[in-house]
Amino acid sequence: MKHDFSLPGADRQEAPVATLSTLFDHAVAAAPDKVALRRLDAVLTYRELGRAVEALARRLARLVEPGDVVALLLPNSLEFPIAYFAALKALAIPALLNPQYPAAQLAPLLREATARAVICAPATRDMVTGLAGDLGIPSVVCLGDDVMVPELVAEAGAALGLRAATPSDSAALLFSGGTTGLPKIVEHTHGRLATGVHCIEHAWPMRGEGEVFLPIAPFTHIYGFATGVLVPLSVRGEIVIPERFQPELVVELLVRHRVTFFGGGPPAIYAGLLAARNLGSADLSALRMCPAGGAPFPVELMERWRHATGLEIYEGYGMSEMAPISAATAQSGVRPGSVGKPIPGGDVQVVDLETGLRVLPPGEKGELRVRGPHMMTGYRNRPEETAQTIRDGFIYTGDIGHVDGDGFVFITERKKDVVFVGGFNVFPREVEELIHTHRSVAMAGVVGVPDARTGGERLVAFVVPRTGETFDPTEISRYCAGRLVSYKCPSEVRVVEQLPITAAHKLDHVALRRAARGEQELSTG
């Protein structure tokens, strides 16, 4: 099924709204009676959403000062966008934290962010209250318990009377992996996030108010936050929020609400839907945009999705530091294995691994560095790590890849994931891609572990069979041996029921490495 991307608004080139607060206000004013959010039986129009945000902002303004950090510890819900935009209205800085984290993992993040208030859900209230007491955080607001959404919608009150936010004000704190073990805080301003929204709207063209979004990725993750909250509200679309990720339920929602933009994200989500019993009979005629991001996407899985639904998967490449994409397909066209071309206003270069300064010609592999008007201001309170990552105006991504002669970007591997086997560099993704082409394989993950025999490393492959399929590990070993040079073949293949997935729905290579070393158990078939 092919779609025309020459749509109203697809060629919009006007400057983005200067702040996210004004972006939100424009949406509320332009489409007050249109449905903004939908979850289960609860529905909020843009007018009701605007009222709820104003009411919560008034309460927050009594608890925090402008510039204070307010931590959002919320699942994907009606409450998340209310809390986020209310914090902005109160001139606070929202810090987006994964609500699935245990207390021991949250405590250092809240401390690092210097949070002065936490907004949470009833499920985590007791834990958050205890943490707040231990850390000296003055305020905890529990949405859905202390404060109910209908109560906020019905509340009347005077305007806040605070100054308007500026493009240079901080608008979000996100968390990215740190070299010391503690995640770094990625800081973005209103202006840079608003520019990022504009970039996404151009990369994956929108139809405006006719768009119906179904996001899967967590709103606390940059991909889910941008494509599931900011972009839909910017174009005054409708956001259908699933209660949970259950493949049959998601397919049902896609059909019932005539979803046009499915923010699937990582490969694990699409693999899950392909296994859904009701996918084959689903009417997906309204669906036109299926973007992917957050993890390398196997070409074979894209082909299976296209065969099952008639729809293309449009990849994007980005990270928390780039809010969130630097390259994307759709307008640039789909090229197998590529994440597309750099977005307008952005730049993607491939540089040598030794110095990071020499720009390589098309076809040569090296480290990708990116820049654009939507890149982070830096890592909060981490000047040294900021200087290591941002050099000469570019963010050094740590990703290995190349650009072809037509300008399409290809990602080969994370720099840190390259495995050294028998004196050769091996890219696990290449091996994963091959294993995915086996007719009986649903998912595969490949990692490197120390090899006591050689003193180097060896490859271990974890493979999940498709529903109803069984095979012996030696079958995969033979399959690889007939198609790869010997040092790229896994020395061990393990058949498992499922692969470990992170909270952002990415394949968890850290857990796979632990399992390969015998430090963690995975369910076997």
Model-derived regions, located:
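Conserved AMP-binding/adenylation subdomain of ANL enzymes
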Residues: A194-V212, T220-F261, A276
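Gly/Ser/Thr-rich phosphate-binding loop
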Residues: V259-G265, L274-R335, D347
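AMP-binding/adenylate-forming catalytic core of the ANL superfamily
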Residues: R58, Y101, V118-C120, F262, ...
